[in-house]
Amino acid sequence: MINKSEIIKEYGRAEGDTGSPEVQIALLTARINELNGHLKTHKKDHHSRRGLLKMVGRRRNLLAYLKEKDLEGYRALIAKLGLRK
């Protein structure tokens, strides 16, 4: 189970920062990883799979925005989350 407050504290720029792209990407990544585990055991859950694809698309858009605005922050975040190889 994801602990939102810990993720916000770790990736946020200030106390209670929930709107920055870094926090949003980290929260989406945690939810995506959790849903991936669910879909491994429930292969026919297509409703959840659609939600997963929507989350992945939203994370992709946020990553593109962050890459454009703050390249160093983008590189640090993907290294910390282990997203790109």
Curated annotation (Swiss-Prot):
The GO cellular component terms are: cytosolic small ribosomal subunit
InterPro entries membership: Ribosomal_uS15, Ribosomal_uS15_bac-type, uS15_NS1_RNA-bd_sf
**Which keywords label this protein?**
Ribonucleoprotein, Ribosomal protein, RNA-binding, rRNA-binding
Q: Which GO terms describe its biological process?
A: translation
Q: Which GO terms describe its molecular function?
A: rRNA binding; structural constituent of ribosome
- Top-level lineage group: Bacteria
Q: What does this protein do?
A: One of the primary rRNA binding proteins, it binds directly to 16S rRNA where it helps nucleate assembly of the platform of the 30S subunit by binding and bridging several RNA helices of the 16S rRNA.
Q: Which family does it belong to?
A: Belongs to the universal ribosomal protein uS15 family.
PANTHER family from the entry?
RIBOSOMAL PROTEIN S15, BACTERIAL AND ORGANELLAR, SMALL RIBOSOMAL SUBUNIT PROTEIN US15M
Q: Can you state the subunit structure given in the record?
A: Part of the 30S ribosomal subunit. Forms a bridge to the 50S subunit in the 70S ribosome, contacting the 23S rRNA.
HAMAP family, A to Z: Ribosomal_uS15_B (MF_01343_B)
Q: What is this protein called?
A: Small ribosomal subunit protein uS15
State the species of origin. Clostridioides difficile (strain 630) (Peptoclostridium difficile)
